[in-house]
Amino acid sequence: ILIIKMKSGNADLPYLLSDYHLVMLPSVDGKVDWASGDGTGPYKIVNHEPGVATEFTRHEGWHREGAYFDGVRLTVLNDANARQTALITGDVDAITDVDLKTISLLQRAPGVVLDNVASGSHVTLPMFCDVAPFDNVDVRLALKYAIDRQEIIDRILFGYGSIGNDHPIAPSLPYWADLEQRVYDPEKAKFHLKKAGAEGLKVSLSAADSVMSGAVDMCVLYSEQAKAAGIDIEVVREPADGYWSNVWLVKPFVFVQWGARPTPDVMFSLAYKDDAAWNESHWQNPRFNELLLQAKSELDDAKRTQMYAEMQMLCKDDGGTIVPFFRNRTMARRENVQHPEEIAGNWELDGARGYHRWWFS
């Protein structure tokens, strides 16, 4: 019997127990044995080279469904062309993060099947709310009105995504609030700039294509769109190495990509709560934090829905984060690799469980 002692109520506990961060490993002399490679999944690690590849073999004693492969090798191929070439030539059986610029060519390749799955994965452009000029909510609103989200989806994602509304809850997820969609409106942006006394606003926006293929192009397009509102956005192309240690959470206006989280509480607690380590916009909103605490333990689904709707509205209208879009998961596989009719979109390769759920035909 597993007994979990909690400091406070959490209605999402069943979902948290399925999150990939929760792992169970062998214990040796009362300490976790990280080196054995054994866990509770269907495969065990036989070789691990960080940044190169990881190899798994199926546990002989696995008795549940799945784990149809005798072994699995996950290879790191950061270059999109290298990934797609490896798939076409048959060197690998499946790839993640298909290059959207060449996706139409890949679709025509013989023996290749594309998977396109709606996801809660999203891009954020967080602004430090405690650093000028972003400490003024009207400046933040001006920058939110100065971005043409649909054009970005069309030109950067080639249609493989859904429009964002400046909060992190995707239309494909529970508790999504059908709020009025913020649209590109340079005149409203000018209104808020004038209200803030920030006409002629100039800001720098940092990005790197290592975060997402097309990240810099997206920021350049945003910069062009913002000119109609009289906003000058200087796009800073940052080095790929060290982006997460030297740019994210360090510079006041940056490009970030988030994976989906299982519930609104997890996402809000990670990146929007006032004292969260990953509060990337330094946003402080007492009402939001009050609702976050209440919703965490609320078992009445109707009340919880209302709370999360208000929280999404607060993010949209007061928060320091622009959420331009949610990305689809675009993956590709050899036609002899099969999977269930429905696959997960929270992480790549069927919620990072493709090796468990998929099979060869």
Regions found by a protein language model. Give the residues of each.
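Solvent-exposed coil/turn segments that connect beta secondary-structure elements
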Residues: I1, K7-A11, Y20, H48-P50, ...
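Short, well-ordered beta-strand elements
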Residues: L2-I4, G41-K44, T54-E55, D70-V76, ...
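Gly/Pro-rich hinge or "lid" segments in bacterial periplasmic/extracellular proteins
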Residues: S8-G9, Y15-G71, D79-N81, P186-E187, ...
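Detector for C-terminal structural segments
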Residues: A11, E49, V123, I147-P174, ...
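Ligand-site clamp/hinge motif
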Residues: K31, E60-L105, S223, D232
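Append "and occasionally in soluble cytosolic enzymes with long acidic Gly/Pro-rich linkers
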Residues: E55-E60, R108, D135-E224, L291, ...
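Short helices/loops that flank or line small-molecule/ion binding pockets
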Residues: N81-D91, R108-A109, V137-D138, D217-A229, ...
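A ligand-binding cleft/hinge motif common to bilobed small-molecule-binding domains
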Residues: V98-A109, A260-D265
